[in-house]
Structure formats: structure tokens, C-alpha cells
Amino acid sequence: MKKLLILGGSGFIGSSIVNYGINKNLIINKINKIYILSRTAKFLQNKKKHISITYINKSMLDVNKLPQVDYIIYCLKNSNIKISNNYFNQFLKILKNFKKKPKILFTSSGAVYGKNINKKKDMESKKIDNILIDNFVGYKKKYAKEKVFLEEKFKELAKKNYNVSIARCYTFIGKNIIYYNYAISDLINAANSKKKIILNSHIDVFRSYMHSDDLSNW
């Protein structure tokens, strides 16, 4: 059986994968052990015999050793690129001590394509355009720039014969979404509490969502 390590596992993607595994879906891929690194991990009371979950309740910068695993999902993020770089460098340092090179998935974002001015579907062949990224306002600009920065780091890691995949994720919905600060969460929580639903836009907005189970299965 295989072992999986999720770095930054308290976020929506990390928690969704854990729930997916608890419901026996990861057994298909022969994963029966999950390690979760997170400073703010929301511990799940897992009583399932088919899968074991271990929490490492620390910051990446405070970790000197990680368990030997077959797969790593890197979900760590920080709007400060300097701090994000420190996380990655610490990860790289620890990775060198692994006896066997694990497969690595970095969760990037569709934000790296920049602001979609023409309202057309982004294609994987589309090149990253820093001018379009600069068209973002607020937190999203920093978020996109951090993802671009880390993508380059993981591409360099792939050149060292690591099996690296980069997932440019967009918007998701699922069981855990109501616990996170997203637009769709606000709408659902308002409806559940029978409050007025407020849309912070004066124009028609169209948004597509992937379910977290489909994300985890992929």
C-alpha cells in the first residue's frame, strides 16, 4: 500500500482529499496512510480501519524531517513571496533526505493566466502574461504572482529527475466549502441561515465549479 503526505492540509483542497480517502475512495489507488502537515489542522476523528491519518501540527519552517512517502501534495501558500520561498527551500532541504523520490503534485491556480479580459476559456497552451496578472487588484495579484514563482521552482525540481505535476486549479465546491472564505461559501451560508443573499457585483457574473470529489479523484 502507498503513503500520501499533504503539505498545507487544513485548506479546502487538503481537507477534501482527506474526506475522499476516509470514504474509501483512495483505496482504489492503494493509499492507506495519509500524513497532514498544517499549523491549523482541523483534526478529523477517523475511525475507519482502511486508512490511517497522522497530523503534523507544525509550520513547514519548524520541520526538519518528514515521513517517507510515495506521494506529496504541496498546498502551502503565502502572499509574501519571500516567506513562500522559505517554505519551498525548507521542503527542498528535507526532500533530499528521502530514500526514494516521491511523486509530487503542486496545487497552482488558473490565476497565473492573469485577468480574463476577453471572457474566453483559458487553455493550457496559453502562456503566462505578467501584464494580465498586473490587471488583477487586491489579494489576487499577489496570489497569482506567488503561484507563478512556485511553478518555476517546481519546474526546476522536475529537472532533477523528480516526477512533478502542476495543477492549475480554478473554483471548487463541495462538503467543506462552507468553512472557508469564498464567495460561494457566503452565498450558501446566507441561504442556510435564511439571511439576505448579497451579490457584490453590478454586472452579470458567470462562474463554473468543479466538485471536490472530482478534484480528489483526478
Residue ranges with predicted function:
Residues 92-142:
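Conserved Rossmann-fold NAD(P)-dependent oxidoreductase catalytic core, especially the SDR/UDP-sugar
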Residues 152-206, 212-214:
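NAD(P)-dependent short-chain dehydrogenase/reductase
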Residues 2-27:
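N-terminal Rossmann NAD(P)H-binding glycine-rich loop of SDR-like oxidoreductase domains
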Residues 143-147:
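Active-site YXXXK catalytic motif of short-chain dehydrogenase/reductase
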Residues 37-41:
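N-terminal Rossmann-fold cofactor-binding loop
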Residues 54-97:
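NAD(P)H-binding glycine-rich loop region in Rossmannoid oxidoreductase-like domains
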Residues 79, 110-117, 170-173:
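Active-site segment of SDR-like NAD(P)-dependent oxidoreductases
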